[in-house]
């Protein structure tokens, strides 16, 4: 999915508002995903998945850091996320549908925390951005 210049501006502005809360929001999105889509827990059998778990917080920070990297390299996401794509495709073997589920939960989390900034245009831009990230992460499955 191609991001327009307006989409890129919206994504960078919205992610800038996330700022220091990125890890917290990443963990919250993971918790939402685990509660809403319990089958996603199968990829984390070694994690304590309870609310506030240090492992979920740690992985939430990893998710947020990867998204921060994608925002910073929005014009070259395939190269920026190449190692992460390899990891998820070849080692972790995560079903690609799970990226869509996490993206949805992240959008809900951002809407809850940033209601003033989460306009329809920003929502659409973030949705396109997360779809692009998902596409890049699943590109090495083929």
From Swiss-Prot:
Changing residue 115 to L: In Nouakchott. Changing residue 7 to N: In Dunn; O(2) affinity up. Changing residue 111 to D: In Petah Tikva; unstable; causes alpha-thalassemia. Changing residue 126 to R: In Plasencia; family with moderate microcytosis and hypochromia. Changing residue 130 to P: In Tunis-Bizerte; unstable; causes alpha-thalassemia. The modification Phosphotyrosine is found at residue 25. The modification Phosphoserine is found at residues 4, 36, 50, 103, 125, 132, 139. Changing residue 114 to H: In Twin Peaks. Changing residue 141 to H: In Rouen/Ethiopia; O(2) affinity up. Changing residue 35 to R: In Queens/Ogi. Changing residue 137 to P: In Bibba; unstable; causes alpha-thalassemia. Changing residue 89 to S: In Loire; O(2) affinity up. Changing residue 12 to E: In Anantharaj. Changing residue 127 to Y: In Montefiore; O(2) affinity up. Glycans are attached at residues 8, 17, 41, 62. Changing residue 139 to P: In Attleboro; O(2) affinity up. The modification Phosphothreonine is found at residues 9, 109, 135, 138. This is Hemoglobin subunit alpha. The gene is HBA1.
């Amino acid at each position: 999915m191609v991001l327009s210049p307006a989409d890129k501006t919206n994504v960078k502005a919205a992610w800038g508002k996330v700022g220091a809360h990125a890890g917290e929001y990443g963990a919250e999105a993971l918790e939402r995903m685990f509660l809403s889509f319990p089958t996603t827990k199968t990829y984390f059998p070694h994690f304590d998945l309870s609310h506030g778990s240090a492992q979920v917080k740690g992985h939430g920070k990893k998710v947020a850091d990867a998204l921060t990297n994608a925002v910073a390299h929005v014009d070259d996401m395939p190269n920026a996320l190449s190692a992460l794509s390899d990891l998820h495709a070849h080692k972790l073997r995560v079903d690609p549908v799970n990226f869509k589920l996490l993206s949805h939960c992240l959008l809900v989390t951002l809407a809850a925390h940033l209601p003033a900034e989460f306009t329809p245009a920003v929502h659409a831009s973030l949705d396109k951005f997360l779809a692009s990230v998902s596409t890049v992460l699943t590109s090495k499955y083929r």
